[in-house]
Amino acid sequence: MVNLTSTELERYRRQIILPGFGQEAQQRLKSATVLVTGVGGLGGTAALYLAIAGVGRLILVRGGELRLDDMNRQILMSDDWVGKPRVFKAKKRLEDINPDVEVEAIFDYVTPDNVDSLIQSADVALDCAHNFGERDLLNAACVRWRKPMVEAAMDGMDAYLTTIIPGVTPCLSCLFPEKPEWDRRGFGVLGAVSGTLACLTALEAMKLITGFSQPLSSELLTMNLHQLTFAKRRSYRDRNCPVCGTHSQHYPHPQQLSRVLVNSQ
C-alpha cells in the first residue's frame, strides 16, 4: 500500500482521526482511481470532495462547453470560462485545490467506443451523466468488468442515490427498466440541491474505497428536498434483466478480473 507523505498526513489529519478511519483508509483513497462522468453541479461537486479527501487519481469525462445557465450550480467554474470546455477548467481547479491529486480530463461524452476503456481504468465509477443513454452504457460496462458504480440523479427538488455492485446488487437496468420521466435536458434545479446529492455521492465512493462504512447496498435512497424527507427502500436483482440477469450477454464477462474496492459483507 502507498505511503503518505508528511504533508498528506497533516492535510488529511482531521479525517484520519475519525474513529475507524485511520491512516489505512487514507492510503486506500490515495491508491484509488475514480471515474466521474459529467462535470456539472453533481459530478463537478462530487469530484471536488473526492479531491480534497485525497483520492489519488480522478478521471473526468464530459463533452460540451460551459453555458451561462450552468453557473448557478458549477462551483468549479468561473464566469470567464463560459463557452469553453468545462472539463479542462475542472481539472485546473482541482489541481490548484489539491496538487497531490492527479486529474485526467477527457473532453468527450461516454460512448460505446470508449466506455470499456474508461471503466477498466477506474476502481469506482460515479454516474453523474446528464442522460440515460450514457448511464445505460456505464451500467453495462460496470457489470461486464465487475466495477462498482455510484448512481445519482435528480429532477427539480427530487433526487435518488444508490450504489451498484455487480453480482451483489441490482444494476441500473433492474431499477429502471424504462427511462424515468425526468430523463430530459433543461430541468429546473437549485445549486444547493445538486450540491447536497453530490456530497452524498462522494461519500458513497469513499465508503466503497475505504471500507470505512457500509455503502447503500441493494437500497435506493430517495430524497424530497422540498420537505427534506429521505427514504430508503430495498431493491432486488431481476433475474431476467437484460444487463445483469442470468442469460445476459453482459454478465458474466470472460475477462472479469478487475478487483472491486468494496467490503460487500
Swiss-Prot record:
Belongs to the HesA/MoeB/ThiF family. GO terms for molecular function: nucleotidyltransferase activity; thiosulfate-cyanide sulfurtransferase activity; ubiquitin-like modifier activating enzyme activity. It holds the Pfam family ThiF. Coiled coil: none annotated. One of its GO terms (cellular component) is cytoplasm. It comes from Trichormus variabilis (strain ATCC 29413 / PCC 7937). InterPro entries: ThiF/MoeB/HesA, ThiF_NAD_FAD-bd, Ubiquitin-activating_enz. CDD domains: ThiF_MoeB_HesA_family (cd00757). One of its GO terms (biological process) is nitrogen fixation. Keywords: Nitrogen fixation. This is Protein HesA, vegetative.
